Amino acid sequence: MSKPIQMEKGVKYRDADKMALIPVKNMPAEQKEVLRKPAWMKIKLPSDSHRIQEIKSAMRKNNLHSVCEEASCPNLAECFNHGTATFMILGAICTRRCPFCDVAHGRPNAPEAEEPKKLAKTIKDMKLKYVVITSVDRDDLRDGGAQHFADCNREIREQNPNIRIETLVPDFRGRMDVALELMKDNPPDVFNHNLETAPRLYRKARPGANYKWSLDLLRKFKEQHPNIPTKSGVMMGLGETKEEIVQVLKDLREHGVTMLTLGQYLAPSRHHLPVERYVPPSEFDELKEIALELGFTHAACGPFVRSSYHADLQAQGMEIK
């Protein structure tokens, strides 16, 4: 029996080290038959990487993080090449250890006080018109990081008066009302919180999270800001059934959510949850039709769709796959 890992502050724990800390153990990929990626899951990389390096340099210069890099998003090259990125605030170490996610786990450092100003300046330098701000979970903070979100929104708007902001927030476990109150005066243009999967799979995929809590967060924000659209994302390929996903869509609509992203789960490494199934594009198309029939005004559904993938186009109602 191996010794438990003693986490050091500010150190990133990934892959096997991260998975060793999860109470619900999952079978390693080498013990299961690994599914081969079908033809529709192949990505064509851009021939010119100049814009990609530009964005990475801007991030490094200001000590900022993108969820695109930290979570090993398959769309990184495409998005960076188009000059878009999803900024990840409050550091790059998460207090949760979800086995589907590639963001590092550990004991994070204190939030950087100058991050809102640095973030706003970087966005201004990049001449962005639409920006997505997300964060790691910060269960170590009394407000879950809500004040930092509010500070970032305020600073971004001061330096970029015509920008539109989408925030992809954590669940603010145990401090929802405090968080919503702190963010009340500096809300985003789109409020996003991902359910990720069906409730049956939460213990396996989202240890520490609660399906009903996440739905309530979306509902309470909508009640507080009835004119701001709310959004949520769900992955497929973790072992859910189509019927379960349809029920998730119904639950989202019942809680006032009008924007949806639905994409294929991809395992970041052999240590993470394995892919149970590759969902064909035709099934995503069917689910999109169901979503629109249920009353979603925006539904981006496809194998490579991610919560912030072409978020600016999603917000305009353009078709994203």
Swiss-Prot record:
Pathway: Protein modification; protein lipoylation via endogenous pathway; protein N(6)-(lipoyl)lysine from octanoyl-[acyl-carrier-protein]: step 2/2. Pfam families: LIAS_N, Radical_SAM. [4Fe-4S] cluster 2 binds at C94, C98, C101. Residues 80-297 form the Radical SAM core domain. This is Lipoyl synthase. Its EC number is 2.8.1.8. It comes from Vibrio atlanticus (strain LGP32). GO terms for molecular function: 4 iron, 4 sulfur cluster binding; lipoate synthase activity; metal ion binding. It is found in: Cytoplasm. Binds 2 [4Fe-4S] clusters per subunit. One cluster is coordinated with 3 cysteines and an exchangeable S-adenosyl-L-methionine. Keywords: 4Fe-4S, Cytoplasm, Iron, Iron-sulfur, Metal-binding, S-adenosyl-L-methionine, Transferase. GO terms for cellular component: cytoplasm. It catalyses: [[Fe-S] cluster scaffold protein carrying a second [4Fe-4S](2+) cluster] + N(6)-octanoyl-L-lysyl-[protein] + 2 oxidized [2Fe-2S]-[ferredoxin] + 2 S-adenosyl-L-methionine + 4 H(+) = [[Fe-S] cluster scaffold protein] + N(6)-[(R)-dihydrolipoyl]-L-lysyl-[protein] + 4 Fe(3+) + 2 hydrogen sulfide + 2 5'-deoxyadenosine + 2 L-methionine + 2 reduced [2Fe-2S]-[ferredoxin]. [4Fe-4S] cluster 1 binds at C68, C73, C79, S308. Its cofactor is [4Fe-4S] cluster. InterPro entries: Aldolase_TIM, Elp3/MiaA/NifB-like_rSAM, LIAS_N, Lipoyl_synth, rSAM. Belongs to the radical SAM superfamily. Lipoyl synthase family. Its main location: cytoplasm.
